[in-house]
UniProtKB/Swiss-Prot annotation:
Its cofactor is [4Fe-4S] cluster; [2Fe-2S] cluster. Catalyzes the conversion of dethiobiotin (DTB) to biotin by the insertion of a sulfur atom into dethiobiotin via a radical-based mechanism. Binds 1 [4Fe-4S] cluster. The cluster is coordinated with 3 cysteines and an exchangeable S-adenosyl-L-methionine. Its EC number is 2.8.1.6. Signal peptide: none annotated. It catalyses: (4R,5S)-dethiobiotin + (sulfur carrier)-SH + 2 reduced [2Fe-2S]-[ferredoxin] + 2 S-adenosyl-L-methionine = (sulfur carrier)-H + biotin + 2 5'-deoxyadenosine + 2 L-methionine + 2 oxidized [2Fe-2S]-[ferredoxin]. This is Biotin synthase. It comes from the Bacteria. Belongs to the radical SAM superfamily. Biotin synthase family. The gene is bioB. GO terms for biological process: biotin biosynthetic process. Pathway: Cofactor biosynthesis; biotin biosynthesis; biotin from 7,8-diaminononanoate: step 2/2. Keywords: 2Fe-2S, 4Fe-4S, Biotin biosynthesis, Iron, Iron-sulfur, Metal-binding, S-adenosyl-L-methionine, Transferase. Residues 41-265 form the Radical SAM core domain.
Length: 346
């Protein structure tokens, strides 16, 4: 019997009941669902590169890349295709199977699309799964990216509809849903999640998950970020999120979206090994690997490989690798930790 069939009609009361289960019961249920759908001892390794940094016109209160706030961020133009491919090649050598490219835009402009499309094509030629996050997408640009071969498009809902206007005013919640719809219409996979710890209530955390799970097709990838407070942003002094609340969010996401990858994204630098291992037990099965995540710190690559080894886990391998030698080397990298830093990653 399937422990958690995919549903798209979750109610507020149902999700609340799951989120508020006794902690041990919640983790047991989430771990059971995870084991029924994934290898519990594999973790997907993704790398995220910032291809254009800062000066974003949006006013997301959590984001140091917003042009509305004074942070110490150095702005960078769209980087050259050749540099992106170089970093993707390094990522593959370090064990990544998925390469994500992010640009601090409200939406990509027509003049940038040829460069963006070329990045996708050349990264895919390396045998890597590709993902981009470029802001809002209309239907035409979504199809253009799909024609270039893009596998995933990331566009987070960020928080619940009820709390959304407390965080962002320059684009609506419906704008985000429309972009996800355009991505689906073009035939790409969806990566969509949110951020917790922005001063929201528990109802907003499970309300976000309800929105994601009730989409016509659930996201194939669900990144759950814990807020990284950055000086100069409006949320720099918000109260810390209780770590058990974060783990509850991971577990509830796993139960509600049993076939999705649940990714530990931003905020891992503030999580000790015990907390991260509990998240893996609760159903998280993907991480961003490397020393930086956009403009914020991420755990050291060596530390990640050491933790994966300590837990007896392995990096997930892709079956369609063009270079079998690289695929075969991933497990050995867990035993022989990477000895050099990755690179600037978004």
């Amino acid at each position: 019997m399937e422990l958690a069939p995919v549903r798209h009609n979750w109610t507020h009361s149902e999700v609340k009941a799951i989120f508020e289960m006794p902690f041990n019961d919640l983790l047991f249920k989430a771990a059971s669902v995870h084991r029924a759908n994934f290898n519990p001892n594999e973790v997907q390794i993704s790398t995220l590169l910032s291809i254009k940094t800062g000066a974003c016109p949006e006013d997301c209160k959590y984001c140091p890349q917003s042009g509305h706030y004074r942070t110490d961020l150095e702005r960078e133009r769209l980087i050259e295709v050749e540099k992106v491919v170089e970093q993707a090649r390094l990522a593959k050598q370090k064990g990544a199977t998925r390469f994500c490219m992010g640009a601090a835009w409200s939406d990509p402009k027509d003049r940038d699309m040829p460069y963006i499309s070329q990045m996708v094509k050349e990264v895919k030629e390396l045998g890597l799964e590709t993902c981009m996050t470029l802001g809002m997408l209309n239907n035409e640009k979504a199809h253009e990216l799909r024609n270039a071969g893009l596998d995933y498009y990331n566009h987070n809902l960020d928080t619940s509809p009820e709390y959304y206007e407390q965080i962002i005013s320059t684009r609506t919640f419906q704008d985000r849903l429309d972009t996800i719809g355009n991505v689906r219409d073009a035939g790409m996979k969806v990566c969509s999640g949110g951020i917790v710890g922005m001063g929201e209530q528990a109802a907003d955390r499970y309300g976000l998950l309800m929105q994601l799970a009730n989409l016509d097709q659930q996201p194939e990838s669900v990144p759950i970020n814990m807020l990284v407070k950055v000086k100069g942003t409006p949320l720099e002094n918000v109260d810390d999120l209780d770590h058990f609340e974060f783990i509850r969010t991971i577990a509830t996401a796993r139960i509600m979206m049993p076939h999705s990858y649940v990714r530990l994204s931003a905020g891992r630098n503030a999580m000790n090994e015990q907390m991260q291992s509990m998240c893996f037990f609760a159903g998280a099965n993907s991480i961003f690997y490397g020393d930086k995540l956009l403009t914020t710190e991420n755990p050291d690559a060596d530390a990640d490989m050491a933790l994966i080894k300590k837990l007896g886990m392995n990096p997930e391998t892709r079956h369609d690798y063009s270079d079998e030698a690289v695929a075969a080397s991933l497990s050995s990298q867990v035993a022989d930790k990477a000895t050099s830093k990755l690179f600037y990653e978004a």
